[in-house]
Amino acid sequence: MGMMQEFKEFAIKGNVIDLAVGVIIGAAFSKIVDSVVGDLIMPVVGAVIGKLDFSNMFVVLRSVPPGIPTTLDALKKAGVPVFAYGNFITVAVNFAILAFIIFLMVKQINRLKRREVVKPTTAPAEDIMLLREIRDSLKKQA
């Protein structure tokens, strides 16, 4: 079998296609979670804490040179070391929500798989049972 034929069989198998679909859906789903965190959850958390914009929460680790604005972007461009923890908080909340949703999805999939495996086996048909009895009877006579 040639390499191209092997690759074709590999690429057409369900697992590769399932993986590709999963990656595409995951990328789109990640954008939804980013929006939920950035647009819905973090503003509520910010309103409770008193700061609405977490991206500008930081601590300057060294003195700021004169004439440099004290915004995070300006300090980073000037090479001033800053401990930018606000963006980390947003990313951590984003990760926690995404991980929880994936956990719920995997839990549901596993529950459905268990339900499929436990299907009761049906008893053989009456004519099959009769044929088996005849077969067993013939074996005993022989």
Curated annotation (Swiss-Prot):
It is found in: Cell inner membrane. Keywords: Cell inner membrane, Cell membrane, Ion channel, Ion transport, Membrane, Transmembrane, Transmembrane helix, Transport. It is a multi-pass membrane protein. The chain crosses the membrane at residues 10-30, 86-106. The keyword Secreted does not apply. The keyword Transit peptide does not apply. GO terms for cellular component: plasma membrane. InterPro entries: Mechanosensitive_channel_CS (IPR019823), MS_channel (IPR001185), MSC/AndL (IPR037673), MscL_channel (IPR036019). PROSITE patterns: MSCL. One of its GO terms (molecular function) is mechanosensitive monoatomic ion channel activity. Channel that opens in response to stretch forces in the membrane lipid bilayer. May participate in the regulation of osmotic pressure changes within the cell. Homopentamer. Belongs to the MscL family. This is Large-conductance mechanosensitive channel. The gene is mscL.
